[in-house]
Every structure is written in structure tokens, then in C-alpha cells.
Amino acid sequence: MKYDTSELCDIYQEEVNVVEPLFSNFGGRSSFGGQIITVKCFEDNGLLYELLEENGRGRVLLVDGGGSVRRALIDAELARLAVQNEWEGLVVYGAVRQVDDLAELDVGIQALAAIPVGAAGEGIGESDVRVNFGGVTFFSGDHLYADNTGIILSEDPLDIE
């Protein structure tokens, strides 16, 4: 499904929070949306492997990497796993790598920047926790919508149809 965050903001202005414009699109899907699962991890993507193994249909993985752009939390291998398990998208408050490969995959990926250095894989981090970045507080179960214009968040799903 295609999402237009500008249109959604016009219709649901009082019901959405708008994330500050910090993110760029790296995935092959220009827009995506779904119910979020929150993750907090710093320069370590081991926990992301576990979560992306789950069925992601209708879900978006929201990763608080502390804003670090020293190590990429998402690479082509993880993005392929997201596609395989039907995740709608990934939002990473951190970095990604292998961007040419990411752009070819049918998954939304928004992140701060790209860097060639990979993350550690020790599995350090926590999921289903409150995270805050970009002027917005995110909880697992909230609904996120993203496109090339921006990212918005709603406590409840928006009536798109």
C-alpha cells in the first residue's frame, strides 16, 4: 500500500506526531507503514536478527541506535531477512550500509546515514521498550507511516482507505 504522509497529516493533524526531518530513504519501497516493534540497541545488531526472523506482515521495526553513525545496524543480509519475513519497513535512528543492495529490496528502510562499518553482533539491547528520538516518543503497538517526505506516528491505525 502507498502512503502519503502529507495527505495523512492534512486529514489527521490532531491525531499524529511528526518525527523531525532527520531521515533518508534507503530501501526499495518509497512508502511503508504498520504497527511498530521498538528496539533499543547501540552499535550492536544481534537482537535485530532475532526480531526480523519473526513474521513481519503489517509491522515496522523501529530501532533506536542512539543516533550513532559510527557502525551500521542494518546491512543487506538483515534487510533480506526482513523481506523474507514480510516486514513492511525499518526505521533506524542510526546508520545502514550496503546501500546499493538495500535500494533493490522490497522493504522500506529509513535511517540517518550510511557508513561501511558493520555493527557488533552480540545481541546487546532490549525490545518492546519506550524510545524517544526526533521529537517523538514511540511505544511498541503504535502505528507508523513513512514516505520520502517524512515519518508520522499515531497511537491508533489511521483509516487509509
From Swiss-Prot:
Gene3D superfamilies: Ribonuclease E inhibitor RraA/RraA-like. Keywords: Cytoplasm. The keyword S-adenosyl-L-methionine does not apply. The keyword Cytoplasm applies. GO terms for biological process: negative regulation of RNA catabolic process. One of its GO terms (molecular function) is endoribonuclease inhibitor activity. Globally modulates RNA abundance by binding to RNase E (Rne) and regulating its endonucleolytic activity. Can modulate Rne action in a substrate-dependent manner by altering the composition of the degradosome. Modulates RNA-binding and helicase activities of the degradosome. This is Regulator of ribonuclease activity A. The lineage of its organism: Bacteria, Pseudomonadati, Pseudomonadota, Gammaproteobacteria, Enterobacterales. The gene is rraA.
